[in-house]
């Protein structure tokens, strides 16, 4: 189980595919998403990584959090989220996750806070059909009708669909396809709509109902201290120079 990422919802647009189709996508932007701390089995009883994103002013950060950011050698963050991971997918503290953490064609689950609609009636909130437009109905055309029972049980059950506050709740949309990523600009483009308003923080994770495709970087795609993405295998490490080899032979 890999770590997710914290992204900012930029808005919606469309992308044109090579076969001429245009696909509606939501643009999500990574804003300096770094690992702030780790949770391990030995110390905490479970494994997880805490990610931070955005750039907060130091004067607006509590002293305890300032110390946490200083120990991790990262700048103060606006948003902190913890992601459960498997022990072999723990990321080092301080690394920055890049957009190619996900690949095109992969499915992800996206969580965000839905846009608030205020107080809404049952026709808008629960898709009720309303009462009849004529024949004895007076000033109750959009009401929900009876809410209770008879003398037994003599109460309204909890969870009864009625008018009330709509939106501004935590929503997860599952199995959205990643259409394209741009590691240089930190953009992830997913097909379809994503819960939340523009400028809001959104969480993106690997889809729990779909297997990971081949080519997904494990434990993830990241860079250290501004370097290029460190997802390359160890076999691609540069060979030693002849001067270094000669120095080793003469030692």
Swiss-Prot record:
Q: Gene encoding it?
A: rplC
- Stated name of the protein: Large ribosomal subunit protein uL3
GO annotation, biological process: translation
Give the record's GO CC terms.
Answer: cytosolic large ribosomal subunit
Report the function annotation for this chain: One of the primary rRNA binding proteins, it binds directly near the 3'-end of the 23S rRNA, where it nucleates assembly of the 50S subunit.
The UniProt regions of compositional bias labelled Low complexity, in chain numbering, are 228-241
State one molecular function term (GO).
structural constituent of ribosome
Q: How is it modified after translation?
A: Methylated by PrmB.
Which keywords label this protein? Methylation, Ribonucleoprotein, Ribosomal protein, RNA-binding, rRNA-binding
The entry's family comment says: Belongs to the universal ribosomal protein uL3 family.
Give the domain of life. Bacteria
Composition-biased stretches, type Acidic residues, lie in 242-251
User: Any idea which residues bear N5-methylglutamine here?
Assistant: 151
What interactions and quaternary structure are annotated?
A: Part of the 50S ribosomal subunit. Forms a cluster with proteins L14 and L19.
Instruction: Return the annotated region ranges for Disordered.
Output: 219-251
Matching entries from InterPro entries are given as: Ribosomal_uL3, Ribosomal_uL3_bac/org-type, Ribosomal_uL3_CS, Transl_B-barrel_sf
Q: Which HAMAP family match?
A: Ribosomal_uL3_B
